[in-house]
């Protein structure tokens, strides 16, 4: 692209943003001459440059806009209509610029409609005669200086502009990022050096090292500062947003922003843009009352949305406050009960603030009407998720009739984070300090105690009972001190969840540079990254959200939306299960349909051969695998469950058959270990349901290779962890092998690598690429043209079904309707003959080999 | 954009007209020798201070600080499913970058760089354990024996393996350590 054009585009993009903001301000205060001059100047520069670069379409539009703005500058009153049409013109200019940036060509089409509207307004606004033109330059045709594309002319007539644009140079974001990375490495090297010299007493090196250390800190600070931008950058687009919202909902709204100079990392500014916009939409749509309602309530006609940013203890606090009607607590309470978030009794015990927090639950909206603004059931939960994703938190308080205050707290930067270095089982881990609430000692006489409830550890902390994750136990680390007394519980908070982590000690507090895990370890959800400590050792960084997940806490679990009790729903299907004991762990179970016989075999008939147990069964050798590593081999008779694998059999050695029952099988906790599908509650007892495939692989590795025991493979795509975790076990328990993906892009990447699936289950509502477009993209992949796709929707309504059909989706199932999902998958796969596909694939792989 | 007159050569492919051959870096594990494509070997070093990764794949020994860079240490022995889990760890490692991630492949010993002629390549013996065969890209007949060439892509395919639900490496390791 032409260098001149490139400069022009970057420059104008910023200026045009500024014009939009200023116009809205102008509408409120038409007397600000300096502002009018600067708006005029910007449009004027664009027009001039367009002529220079031969951009005719843009030039005409800018000219028409300039004429109208010129009229206003000359003293005409900016009517709302005039401002609206100018804003529309600026939008059009933006669109044309965007196209220019992509193709380096002006797009086809003309702007006759807008030009006419602008001319109409120019004629409509009257100019009082008493205003002479301010300076000669403003009415003069573009001068050579003005056509300089990279910079508006800085002349003496523009004091306002000069003050606003201090001396700056443009630096590519990538260059700044690189400097940041290098400084991070420098900090690490400095820390290592400090650690080394701590043990030495050589004074000659100490002084320069101190200096190096100080300089490094200063440099780090300076670079961080360079990445900082005033939050005002974000605020600048808000007046226009509020103006549009106000006219859309027919309310009068003032916007007040405070603390625009507060600085934060540019990465974060971009990340909070969407949540902030969303919250303001909410205030405008729900918070602020109509002018009539406000007057009736004795308030000023115009509502106020106040947005303030401030620094507070290494964090940025942004408050969004409205003086509207406040949250309708009784209505939220009702709705919470109606959608099954909480029971009557529970809600009665909750404080108002707790009840307010329900609005952060997924799909929660009390809005009666669905407008284009809000009330669509997506909203505050997304805001909360976005804020929490960057290590922030959101809270709110509300007074009926007086207004609502949302408060966001976010860290200053994401690159370097203070962390607690904790020890457990002789290993060290880093724990991001932002999630740490406190550390609680458990020694004798300590105020708080660790207790066991049915084998699970909990901490009684003041009036709360927190689940506690024992790092040693979780990670299978040898625990030297089995004495809780010497240990600590670090209390963590992730969003609304609190839990504890049991560690042996807190070794240190350090600033760490977070580095992401490589692909080989990225699947470990309990770790968010790794870092090098001052002493040169590598430590893993614990992921608080992942740890919460390992405790069975879900980010959304306290808002766990369960479908309201449906009396017409069919009862759960009952499965015949064989219950048995193997090893010391809880009772185990297998669906009886998998077991062909139950045999009793004496120990002396079990022979060790090549590391595997073998016995004679119906005249043939049969491999036997213990159902648990600690099944005792005594001289007594052993029950063996004989499982048939496509013509071959294998035995599963157990300690004792307990019972055969017929119960609904509902996997409640997905299995963490390889050998279990998950844990189900059967007759009030937790029972591990074994994954028979695991044992078949052990006993008859070739059976699986030959595919006789192959199961259908399903790819599950959903952007929400909650649903992935909920639906994957449902599909697994349905007998499918499930692979999960968090986005359409990930899923497509898997397919592109040639990984074959028999069906895809996808969410419809996903960011970036939704389920419909994903389905179309899948069917365009080679070999995936006929891959059945089942879509998940909150409610499979007619429009959803139509859209699904149009994009080649085979079936739609409700997200909370497990049975419908399994039925849909079964139907879609019923035409697929497992054996045939298998044969085909085998021939193909043999050919390929 | 390349300047006129320059041509890009793929360094992994032989230039036309030359004898097709392959240079391999040999490593020893137990009594077996393997070849690694020479272009994938970056450095050889002794590892110290391994940070284990709880819940990680069994053949990942842990994380190592290699001159300020974090590398994932993988035991070739465990990768080949030869060693029970409690075998003492070797310290000789080969630095290999694969798919943007830095790995240290732990081996018992390193040998020479040898040149394998195309004419010496043999077909894969059909009865090799499929799990093993998957890790090998070619076999060459040498004077001293047959040299299997490790397929770096298959050896470091963690990303793929972790995505699929199976964890065959664990199973093999467990059955073998039962003894």
Report residues per predicted region:
Chain B
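An acidic, low-aromatic, low-complexity terminal/linker signal
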Residues: 1-179
